[in-house]
Amino acid sequence: MSSDTKTLENSKGNSATDADTKNPSSSDSRAIEQLVTQGNMAYAQKNYEEAVDKYGQALMQSESIHGSESLENRNVLWLYGKSLFQIAIENSQVLGNALGAKESVSQATESFEEPEAIGSFTFSGQKIENKYTVNEENSSIAHPEKESEEKETNEASPASEEDEDDFNVAWEVLDLTRVMQSKAVDAYPDSKDEKIRLADIYDLLGELSLEIENFSQASQDLKTALEWKEKVYNVSNNTLLSEAHYKLALALEFTNPEDPSNKSRACEHVEKAAEILKNVLNERENEVTDKKGKGKQKAEESTLTSDLENLREMLSELEQKTLDLKHGAPSLEEAVMSKMHESSLLSKDSSSLAQAVAEAVKNANDLGGLVKRKRTKQEVTSSSQKEGPKDKKKKD
């Protein structure tokens, strides 16, 4: 997601022609860009509270200039939503440590400091962190479909409810971003940047659903993210696609584990992830051979060799995962539950399952991480209602 630092610049050419733009002054534009730059710096330093504050102020100014429905707002809204998601992760981790609750999925990829309170500021007459808050009566995270689950939720601790509300707020902002970005793709059908952004949004919505263990919704969003990525990337040799296939496989495996069709579909995506990774590995091996022949420096050669080792290890894991899915090896959930039973831990929370999911998602993100370090400048530049994530159907 490092490409988002250039988000505002990448999309100016498209968004500047929006019909609802009110021709802001150059000083207004500079003020917004300065706030976004400050937010980017805070985000890069994992100071997500500061990032939310800066992006929120930029969003205030953008809405006051262009109007709340303008596509001009979508880029800042995306950055704002990503930061809210990271804060939800942080708060979930802090509460999890205090309550002995589950580890965050994203903790597997990043470490976080204990967050401070989000700063308050006004936005269209409301605090910005409350602008997208879901009414608890309508929140499908806090109030699942089944009556028994509703009772459990109502009896949940205030800390747990606060954790869920953080994810609700992030979800609502990201889902609004999805709606705006879908319109941008329709408005600029030839723009690769807009399609990549939409794929990124669906991907993050999928990760959010994995965080709250809503695997069915995660499957839907990650499937859509994969479809968009396949439209803009080389299908045969891009590890971002390998990552996308593996994430979707993970979500499918956990979606109704008793349904054998889900495991079969998961296996297909793991096989595809392995196939893509094998192509990447072959290309990298040829690259190492070429550089050796040209007498490249040892440091560069060592980096390439290290990448090859990581790729081979990941490929081996994917191939083993394929065998497990094909030949009836215990699923990740079954293995965890069996271990919990052996240890007489069935009365405790689902932290072990969440940790296992976290490790699997880490492996998926590692697949994409390898290519993110190697992508060209052009690729890096390119990458730059109201229903909750439990059971919503998206509406544009």
Swiss-Prot record:
It holds the Pfam family SHNi-TPR. Residues 343-353 have a biased composition (Low complexity). TPR repeats lie at residues 32-65, 89-122, 199-232. Keywords: Coiled coil, Nucleus, Repeat, TPR repeat. Residues 143-154, 284-301 have a biased composition (Basic and acidic residues). GO terms for molecular function: histone binding; histone chaperone activity. The keyword Ribonucleoprotein does not apply. Its main location: nucleus. Residues 1-31, 135-164, 284-307, 334-396 are annotated as: Disordered. It is found in: Nucleus. GO terms for biological process: CENP-A containing chromatin assembly; DNA replication-dependent chromatin assembly. GO terms for cellular component: chromatin; nucleoplasm; nucleus. Disulfide bonds: none annotated. Residues 267-329 form a coiled coil. Belongs to the NASP family. Interacts with cnp1, hht1, hht2 and hht3; has a preference for CENP-A (cnp1) over histone H3 (hht1/2/3). Histone H3 and H3-like CENP-A-specific chaperone. Promotes delivery and incorporation of CENP-A in centromeric chromatin, probably by escorting nascent CENP-A to CENP-A chromatin assembly factors. Required for central core silencing and normal chromosome segregation. This is NASP-related protein sim3.
